[in-house]
């Protein structure tokens, strides 16, 4: 037992055990601490795109919020109307509702669906706000979604057809914003909307009689 204790006392400590590895790393010209918890560097730079550019507001239609609330109300009303059809069918099968009332409920539900489709088609193309980037090359259109919420669409200014080439007149209730590519058409009203930056607006859509 005494011999074993003397052998343990003479053996190198834990600090000496790591010296060969330390010498190996140092001979390689590398710091061993670099390998502890290190990993490949991650780039924090975001890719450049329209979302990262600065835009200037050039047009605003203040009533777009009211149209958004109206769109949500119409979706809720249509959902309730359609949800009332299954109970109506059950009542008719049990003889609790005449056939004429069932037809009336079905007609109301069909009319509500048709109105929702028409209103959604128009509201999703109604322009609430127009922005132009500082270089004047990108047009950002803020409009509504099917659910009455805001959505931004980016269009190259070079693809936008000037309103001076459109058959629509500024005195009309709505004017169309069209693209040469034919991707999407929007509607804006100069009668009830406000042009906030006339210079940038005319750079995109041309000089209109209503803005002179």
From Swiss-Prot:
This is Transmembrane protein 186. Residues 100-101 are mitochondrial intermembrane. It is found in: Mitochondrion inner membrane. Its main location: mitochondrion. GO terms for cellular component: mitochondrial inner membrane; mitochondrion. GO terms for biological process: mitochondrial respiratory chain complex I assembly. The chain crosses the membrane at residues 79-99, 102-122. The keyword Metal-binding does not apply. Belongs to the TMEM186 family. Part of the mitochondrial complex I assembly/MCIA complex that comprises at least the core subunits TMEM126B, NDUFAF1, ECSIT and ACAD9 and complement subunits such as COA1 and TMEM186. Interacts with MT-ND3. Residues 1-78, 123-212 are mitochondrial matrix. Pfam families: TMEM70. As part of the MCIA complex, required for efficient assembly of the mitochondrial complex I. It is a multi-pass membrane protein. Keywords: Membrane, Mitochondrion, Mitochondrion inner membrane, Transmembrane, Transmembrane helix.
């Amino acid at each position: 037992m005494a011999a074993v204790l003397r052998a343990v006392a003479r053996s190198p400590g834990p600090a000496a055990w790591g010296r060969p590895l330390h010498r190996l790393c140092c001979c390689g010209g590398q710091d061993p601490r670099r390998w502890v918890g290190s990993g490949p560097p991650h780039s924090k730079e975001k890719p450049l795109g329209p979302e990262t550019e600065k835009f200037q507001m050039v047009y605003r239609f203040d009533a777009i919020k009211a149209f958004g609330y109206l769109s949500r109300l119409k979706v809720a009303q249509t959902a309730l109307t359609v949800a009332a059809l299954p109970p109506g069918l059950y009542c008719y099968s049990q003889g609790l509702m005449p056939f004429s009332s069932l037809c009336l409920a079905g007609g109301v539900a069909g009319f509500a669906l048709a109105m929702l489709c028409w209103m959604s088609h128009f509201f999703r193309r109604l322009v609430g706000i127009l922005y132009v980037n500082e270089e004047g090359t990108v047009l950002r259109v803020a409009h509504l979604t099917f659910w009455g919420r805001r959505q931004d669409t980016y269009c190259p200014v070079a693809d936008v057809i000037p309103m001076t080439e459109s058959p629509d007149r500024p005195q009309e209730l709505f004017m169309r914003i069209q693209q040469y590519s034919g991707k999407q058409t929007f509607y804006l009203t100069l009668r009830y909307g406000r042009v906030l930056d006339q210079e940038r607006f005319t750079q995109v859509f041309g000089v209109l009689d209503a803005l002179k």
